[in-house]
Amino acid sequence: MHILVTGFAPFDNQNINPSWEAVTQLEDIIGTHTIDKLKLPTSFKKVDNIINKTLASNHYDVVLAIGQAGGRNAITPERVAINIDDARIPDNDDFQPIDQAIHLDGAPAYFSNLPVKAMTQSIINQGLPGALSNSAGTFVCNHTLYHLGYLQDKHYPHLRFGFIHVPYIPEQVIGKPDTPSMPLEKIVAGLTAAIEAISNDEDLHLALGTTE
């Protein structure tokens, strides 16, 4: 399959974003998949247009977006995105939407159509911390996953799409002893394992939910 893997620019006064750092280190061929890479702006208003133009000019079987989730201690494939922008902080264009629908004609939520449990289990099988997430937040990451679901629903019915959040890397948590992080090479290994699992046509039937 031809897979587009995206990462984000740094945001919130940081000078690095582990999502893009990890994406740049992925191999160009993973299993049977050909990998293209794209850096996305951490911008509510710009990210949709860049994705739209990229999909209009290239054929991809899969789009897999990667984002930073500071505070998480595992690599977390996302199950679902919701139709709301509700930003705790401004994006890189100083835009801070609050309680704003992403697409007025979109569904309340879009579920990733990738085998997210198989991807999660593949990460775990590498001896790495992996968990299935049921919330992509309400910042640009959720916005991006939702927009991909919207495009699949409205324009690209054969497109497969998903999102994975990754933790901080160690250099981002210097002086923050209680904040989890993960070495970049382990994030790259986890993403590689997840991408290899995308070949599964059907997801695994595993108890990877929560008790919350």
From Swiss-Prot:
Q: What CDD domains would the database entry show?
A: Peptidase_C15
Reaction(s) catalysed by this chain, per the record, are: Release of an N-terminal pyroglutamyl group from a polypeptide, the second amino acid generally not being Pro
| Catalytic class of the enzyme | hydrolase
Q: Which domain of life is it from?
A: Bacteria
Q: Which UniProt key words apply to this protein?
A: Cytoplasm, Hydrolase, Protease, Thiol protease
* Cystine connections: none
Principal place where this protein is found? cytoplasm
Q: What is its EC number?
A: 3.4.19.3
One Pfam family hit = Peptidase_C15
Could you state a single Gene Ontology molecular function term? Answer: pyroglutamyl-peptidase activity
The answer to whether keyword Hydrolase applies is yes
* GO biological-process terms attached to the record: proteolysis
InterPro entries reported in the protein's UniProt record: Peptidase_C15 (IPR000816), Peptidase_C15-like (IPR016125), Peptidase_C15-like_sf (IPR036440), PGP-I_bact-type (IPR029762), PGPEP1_Cys_AS (IPR033694), PGPEP1_Glu_AS (IPR033693)
Active site located where? E78, C141, H165
Where does this polypeptide localize? Cytoplasm
Q: Which GO terms describe its cellular component?
A: cytosol
State what this protein does: Removes 5-oxoproline from various penultimate amino acid residues except L-proline.
Family the entry assigns = Belongs to the peptidase C15 family.
| Complex formation | Homotetramer.
Q: What is this protein called?
A: Pyrrolidone-carboxylate peptidase
Report the gene name: pcp
